Amino acid sequence: MIFDSYANSALQFANRIAMAPMTRCRADHGDAVPNELILEYYRQRASAGLIISEGVPVSDRARGYLNTPALWNEAQAAGWKPVTEAVHAEGGRMFAQLWHCGRISHAALHADGSAPAGASIKRAATQTMVPGADGKPVATDCGQPQALSIQEIRGVVAEFAHAAKLAMQAGFDGVEIHGANGYLLDQFRCPALNDRNDAYGGSLANRYRLLLEVVDAVAAEVAPERIAVRQSPYGVANDMVADPEPLVTYPWLARELNRRGIGFLHIYCQSTDWIHDATHSMMPALRDAFHGAIIACGGFKTPAACEAILARGHADLIAIGKPFISNP
């Protein structure tokens, strides 16, 4: 089944294999414009039914790592254009993953020296890379975040929408909103991090308010069936705390996305066993709640494991990462 084609109302993929988004850090940090190395990297992997790009920051303050190609200005969009053209020439399809790192960042990564943005002021007990005195990358603790104001939150929503518009201009077939892995949108979802007492904190609906505002703003620029949203149930990457009620949280979001006609729900579980663990028990609930395509990602070590999830109807596409970058 994994080599069967897949289509929705807007897109057709040659097979059900998606190349998972993987940060590669191959751009120049100054302008964050994709280069020839990035073009060749994606062109070589265009046999995937769908390529989901590495995370592309939607603004300078959205950056959390050195040398990531971005998508907040015309020059960056122009840099992505030959990349998407190369993928299309090989028969592939490509989504841009829109990314705001939030507190997983450092002031040294931002041109204006601004502090990392966060749902709250709770600092991440993890590290990132910043330029050293000699210009070479050095590891350092993530910086102290500042809790976003309501006005700044509105700005973040606008940044995602603008990046989505640029993605279409650059020739991407769609976009993925990165709401997983402990980055900004996931930070707002997490009750252990989000201690806000305004419209963006407290209840589940409030904690997902930012993500859904981003979804709605992006859907004004990109057809909903060309939009994916990534989530990471049970995820604890980047100093996150596991959701206390995952079987409530994620089906709730799936229903909201379904109501909006979103095309893809991307579920990532790091190094998991999709056949036997808790993620497996969640998939029927997600399928009931969401009628678009479900992408399953994480821990697929064999073709048989991929086929099993497809055969059970728990997913429509399988996203894999390491096999696309391992040595032959």
PLM ranges: what are they?
Residues 1-328:
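Flavin-dependent oxidoreductase catalytic cores
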